[in-house]
Amino acid sequence: MDFILCCGDFLNSEELRVEELRNINAMIERLKHAVIVAISGNHDPQTENSAYRKIDWSKRFYLAPAGTGRVALSSYRTVITYHSWNQKEMEQPLELPKPSAQQGQYQILMLHGDTAAESRYLPLDAQALSQSGFDYVALGHIHKMQQPAPDVYYCGSLEPLDFGESGEHGFFMVDVEGERRRCRFIPFAQREYRTI
């Protein structure tokens, strides 16, 4: 695995203690070869009190600055375009960013938002995302795994967070070889909620 994308709410709280953050950072350090690229979402916006500001993070963890931007992972021939939050709600749709003009690069878009018609959490148009020119669109905010449009994926949360989150939880593994890519869901959760 070369890199891991986290589309918001990596910390899911501003209330974490420094000791908890150091434990998370130590786990990240144990990733021998992978880098984590994260954007902030509605539960972990980059504000003055952000938990992200409490410690110095591992070099393996890249938190995209608030706003819209790009990060190039040249060793992987990949450019990631993102929007990272600095507030708890975003009711206005975002002007959809365009892929990088760099030729021969795999183009990824990372957003934290909601494909529901009306939302206080960055309303997104799944079809517009699918037709945006990105090779892969990684979304966060919805905790259930789903693919709302071609090349547009919510992996959901790795673990169910409450009784309303039944079903499989895990992540998407995306393998890229030249022009071909294969996207498969990998179940990961250690616990499961079921309706009886």
Q: Residue spans of the language-model regions?
A:
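Binuclear metal-dependent phosphoesterase catalytic core
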Residues: 68-74, 155-196
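His/Asp/Glu-rich metal-coordinating catalytic cores
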Residues: 3, 12-162, 168
